[in-house]
Amino acid sequence: MGDLKGSRKRKAVTRDLDEEPGVVSGDELNLDALDGDLSDKSHDTEHSSDSEIELVDDLSSDDGEEYEDEFDSDEIPSDIESKPIREKSKPDRGVDIFVRGEEVTSDGELGDGYDDDKLNYRVTKDANGNERYIYDEINPDDNSDYSEADENANTIGNIPLSFYDQYPHIGYNINGKKIMRPAMGQALDTLLDSIELPKGFTGLTDPSTGKPLELNQDELELLRKVQMNEITEDGYDPYQPTIEYFTSKLEIMPLNAAPEPKRRFVPSKHEAKRVMKLVKAIREGRILPYKPLTEKAEAEEGVWTYDLWANETPRADHPMHIPAPKLPPPGYEESYHPPPEYLPDEKEKAAWLNTDPEDREREYLPADYDALRKVPGYDSFVKEKFERCLDLYLAPRVRRSKLNIDPESLLPKLPSPEELKPFPSTCATLFRGHSGRVRTLAIDPTGVWLASGGDDGTVRVWELLTGRQIWSVKLSDEEPVNVIRWRPSKDAVVLAAATGDSIHLIVPPILDPEMEKASLDIVDAGWGYAKTLTSDSTKKTSAQWTRPSPSLLDSGVQAVISLGYVAKSLSWHRRGDYFVTVCPGTATPVSLAIAIHTLSKHLTQHPFRRRLKGGGPPQAAHFHPSKPILFVANQRTIRSYDLSRQSLVKILQPGARWISSFDIHPTSSTTSGGDNLIVGSYDRRLLWHDVDLSPRPYKTLRYHQKAIRAVRYHSNYPLFADASDDGSLQIFHGSVTGDLLSNASIVPLKVLRGHKVTGELGVLDLDWHPREAWCVSAGADGTCRLWT
């Protein structure tokens, strides 16, 4: 018996069994093991080739799949074992047909249990006398894919009807007969057909028949559904309830617990290779994104391009045309996600809201958003654009020529600080001993001794190099020592100290006997002259030259000048016979604020009888180093007076709010050909004045954070320095040449920091060494420092 699965013969009419028997394929079926024999009822010796009927099921159908599942068992059902089966080796020609467990005889009659069903075939004899099974034609019902063929249908296939234009027929039907060409309607019939359109009229011609193409009701309904974008299938529900296959039931274990493969999150190297091939082809020009059209292709497509502005001549702008200024580019604060430092806090937001719109710095408040899609509309957009339009057509425009100059070329070429050495850079010696602030200090003309005075009312003399205290004297228990200065001449050593309303002239007992005797003679020479002058003079002065008390006399104090008012400034003349004092107090009378004292005569003079016009009370005064000129500074101006002519020479206007100190260049009018001075102010300014150049400052330096207390020139080196309340000293190089056409050059050199800021006060005074590039500073922290 042949293989059941490989057969594709016609299926016999069968009837389902109550129990589905097991069937095994021919490869697995052992015919020798069967107990039953083939039945031998009739036709035992007839036609061995046709004696066997293969009953085959279509295994590709659904029934076949069910049978495969049912016949997987290795056991042979008892129903089949009980049926007689004919073996191939037996010569019996009789055929017993078993259709799904029912017996069919060779005469075409059903066995037991199959009397009610009708066979779909009949058995006849062929030309050789063998049996022949003739099956009935299949009459398809409505559910069948088979349909009756239209005998009048044209069977020419896809051949165009134009091939039959020369023939009276248009094709052949299924029986091979010619299909004659339909009669053509007259013009009147065509008009009537166009007026009264039949149902299903399309206006088209059926290519297979040549007749007008008409659609039936089903086809019209199909077209309507397609036109209305509806589902063409009848009974289709597009909104069927969703069946949740996985989420409807709670799963304890995962459906698939396999780990994610590496290819899920690693870029594919094969795709990378293919992409690199495409990139290489694009770079080499073998792949073009848009294939350019050739002239021939453009001509075939009928595309012609014309340049509308080929013959257009450019029109010149108006001579007075000025383009509109561009808007400034947006800043960080206009970003939808600005840095945190650009976002205002609650206090800044409240201040912005309380400010008038005209006084606000910007028209908006920076805001932070996570994404650009969350940024709302700008409510002032229309207003901003409207104001921009107003500015464009209402505001006048001015064309300004822009100079293309390198900013660095405008800066002076300053030398390197390394080329300008020597200058002080480090702290060499620290002087400790005062209790309280050290207000003033000075180095003697020999450069060996340092004198200092402070709030404790004492004057101390130190050895400059070692920092050892040599001598001290207490001048007052209540008043501080405001100013202390050495006599500039080297033939005698006299120290002038201003304490309260008195000036003490001191000869420290630290000198050799000859120098000490010469110093005492200079101070004592004026006592007899002062006595004679007082007896002969009719004018009375408030300043009194007196001898000190025995205790002060033993300490080295040789004379005391009582001014009656507190002196804050003291300056010697270059010859050492005159010194000027200034009492800047508001209670000081105008005529007594400035006093010039003569050491050799013990004489005090008040050169100013009237108040200086403008600028407030006087602050400091200095003698010119080579001319009989006195410079007097009040709060806002500096005046120079010729003492020989008793006239005003010049008024300098530094522009500072409150002048604290000033100093005159030591080589003024000798080698430089002009006067130069520096001015320090409480508003943190350091000003350089060239007197011959202008009454205004030549340079203004703003390097300090707090008020400047003192400024000083070096006597031999082109150096000057200033001291500030921020606890620092700044060293500058200032060179002055004799060429009147060249200006002074100023180079910042060094910032010296070491003093502590105490009570909002830092460095109160400074002085230069007469020979070396050293300077000393006095601080509010109670120390003095030597910078070398």
UniProtKB/Swiss-Prot annotation:
GO CC annotation terms, alphabetical:
nucleoplasm; PeBoW complex; preribosome, large subunit precursor
> Source organism's superkingdom?
Eukaryota
Q: Name one GO molecular function term.
A: ribonucleoprotein complex binding
Region (Disordered) residue spans? 1-91
Residues folding into a coiled coil are none
| Record-linked Pfam families | BOP1NT, WD40
Keyword Nucleus present in the record's keywords: the answer is yes
Q: Where is the composition biased (Basic and acidic residues)?
A: 38-50, 80-91
**InterPro entries, sorted:** BOP1/Erb1, BOP1_N_dom, WD40/YVTN_repeat-like_dom_sf, WD40_repeat_CS, WD40_repeat_dom_sf, WD40_rpt
Keyword set, alphabetical order: Nucleus, Repeat, Ribosome biogenesis, rRNA processing, WD repeat
Q: Which GO terms describe its biological process?
A: maturation of 5.8S rRNA from tricistronic rRNA transcript (SSU-rRNA, 5.8S rRNA, LSU-rRNA); maturation of LSU-rRNA from tricistronic rRNA transcript (SSU-rRNA, 5.8S rRNA, LSU-rRNA)
Gene3D superfamilies registered for this protein in UniProt: YVTN repeat-like/Quinoprotein amine dehydrogenase
Regions of biased composition (Acidic residues) lie at: 51-78
**Do the record's keywords include Repeat?**
yes
The segments carrying the WD repeats are: 433-472, 476-516, 613-651, 654-699, 703-742, 758-788
Q: Where in the cell is it found?
A: Nucleus, Nucleolus; Nucleus, Nucleoplasm
Which PANTHER family does the protein's record reference?
Answer: RIBOSOME BIOGENESIS PROTEIN BOP1 (PTHR17605:SF0), RIBOSOME BIOGENESIS PROTEIN BOP1 BLOCK OF PROLIFERATION 1 PROTEIN (PTHR17605)
Family, according to the entry, reads as follows: Belongs to the WD repeat BOP1/ERB1 family.
Q: State the protein's purpose.
A: Component of the NOP7 complex, which is required for maturation of the 25S and 5.8S ribosomal RNAs and formation of the 60S ribosome.
The UniProt subunit note reads as follows: Component of the NOP7 complex, composed of ERB1, NOP7 and YTM1. The complex is held together by ERB1, which interacts with NOP7 via its N-terminal domain and with YTM1 via a high-affinity interaction between the seven-bladed beta-propeller domains of the 2 proteins. The NOP7 complex associates with the 66S pre-ribosome.
The molecule here is called Ribosome biogenesis protein ERB1
